[in-house]
Amino acid sequence: RDVAPSRGLGDVYKEEGIVTDKPENDSIKNNNIVAVRFVEHDIKANDTTCFNVVLPGFENYPNYYTYPDVFRYVDNGTSVAGVFTEGSMYAKYGTTDVPPGWLLALKYVTNYAHVRMIVPSKMGHQSANQYVNPYFYDIRKFQKALN
């Protein structure tokens, strides 16, 4: 049993490295170019369907992971959007639309964030929406591109 005196939550957050305030200059804002490294997993089919990180068994296929996906983030105050400019999501699904589920996280994370999320079909890419498939994303890094 822990008999140490109780500490305030602020102490725990500082020790655990949890960021409670998002620095303004570390936020992803309107018109930022964002590079992303991720793994997409089709929950229904239990299959990894798209990725741009090194995965076991794919070390000898650098075309899959050499470059990140890149998109422009647009926030007009009432809605947000993302437009892929390059990468594997555009190549696989043939659309420049960033899955809306990805964009929801950007208001709450900082540069270099690692996010794991389940995106329901209605918040996913066109294929997810059409076939009513939820996807799990392990987004290893959201990173503002250097201007």
Residues covered by each model-derived region:
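Glycine-centered flexibility sites
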Residues: 8-10, 23-25, 40, 101, ...
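A beta-strand/beta-hairpin structural motif
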Residues: 43-141, 145-146
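Short, solvent-exposed beta-strand/turn "edge" segments of beta-rich domains on protein surfaces
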Residues: 19-32
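Single conserved hydrophobic/aromatic residue that forms the stacking wall/gate
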Residues: 2-13
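A short beta-strand signature
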Residues: 30-44
